[in-house]
Amino acid sequence: MNRIVLAALALLSTLVTAQAFTATAQTRSSFVTVKNHQFYLNGSPYYYVGANYWYGSLLGLEKDDRKGVGRLRKELDFLKANGVTNLRLLAGAEGAGMINGVIRVGPPLQPRQGEFDVQVLDGLDLALSEMAKRDMKAVIFLSNNWEWSGGFQQYLDWNGLVPEGMRTRKLTWEEQREIVSKFYGCEPCKASYNRQASLILGRTNRYNKRKYTEDPTIMAWELANEPRPMRPFAVEAYRRWVADVAALIKARDKNHLVTIGHEGYMGTEDLKLYEEIHADKNVDYLTIHIWPKNWEWFKGHALREGFANVLEKTLSYIGQHLPVAERLGKPLVIEEFGLPRDGHSFDPAAPTSLRDAYYAKILSFVEQHAAAKGHIAGLNFWAFGGTARPSKGQTFWKAGDSYTGDPPMEEQGLNTVFDSDESTWKVIRATGKSLSGGRAANN
């Protein structure tokens, strides 16, 4: 009898061990990884259509369900149904109130330097928990080069490096460059950034009880949204900061990818520097952002007249960065791109024929590279506005308004894709369904 019991126990132990091993292997394969120059998910190459949904991490904090939790769930269902499976989210804002002439988004994760309102991360918890139910992936940026969520300028303000007369007023471009460039040499600023990053990396989701570092819903951590050296004198400190933060993240989280959140040449004005910082062993993939309006690829509101030039320069910009990814043997993501509506209108009812054509061209790159197992591995259009609409008679966002995809300093409706933009969704859906269908067939 004892031999039979012992044999049964041994068999049971073997089965439990095998099941545990299988479960661990399945969990590991559900993380996005990089193999050679491709993303992999569940053992197959992962090419994707994604969206910038930065405010998705803030919706769960809204008191009104229609503007908050209900909206989040409805919009995630909508995105999934349209083939969008990858979302870029803000981790948390720094500071509150007016900065650089605008009211920043919030509530802040770090209201004052070194003080954290950890309940603000409940919003990110909810977004990740709901995304997991829909098999979606998140890219999370840990801070911001720009002021609309506080970002680097707020760290500098806390440490006395923003002159009194410049703390809230709208800065000139040269003033902003001069101020933000000091971040990389400001030791207390960087220490506060590191504390916030470490807090986020150490978080356990209150909804599904998963540690962030063990949650396969997260695809990647991003150092910041569009970190730039801003001035030549800051380049070496900037280079060290990128390497130090990428190493810090990898030391605390072995499961997730790391990227910088970079625009490309326009973020450094030096393609060699762009290549060098992305060559870092702790940086897993490259990104570029493409902004025809901001970079004056068309004049004023003359989008139709300048559209041929927009396409030409976009193709050239992608072509400029693709060889860098090829030399480094890493994936490249077109992480932001956008274009105004026809006639440069902010009205959600205005047509989007030029935007649709522009999206179709960029989406085609991902499809082509997916078919050829190439380096361009995904995209995130800027930006998803979902069910929100700009407030009538009001150009810019105000506290209490529903978030669209356009940050507070930009006209609401400028680059946002609303759920009502059916012609745009037709273009997005075709590629999104094609790529997600291909993954399903391979699994």
Outline where the language-model segments fall.
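Acidic, serine/threonine/proline-rich low-complexity intrinsically disordered regions
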Residues: 299-301
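Bacterial N-terminal signal peptides
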Residues: 7-17
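Boundary at the C-terminal end of the N-terminal hydrophobic targeting segment
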Residues: 18-25
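Short, solvent-exposed mixed-charge patches
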Residues: 441-443
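Active-site mouth of glycoside hydrolases
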Residues: 27-297, 306-331, 337-435, 439
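Positively charged n-region of N-terminal signal peptides that target proteins for export
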Residues: 1-4
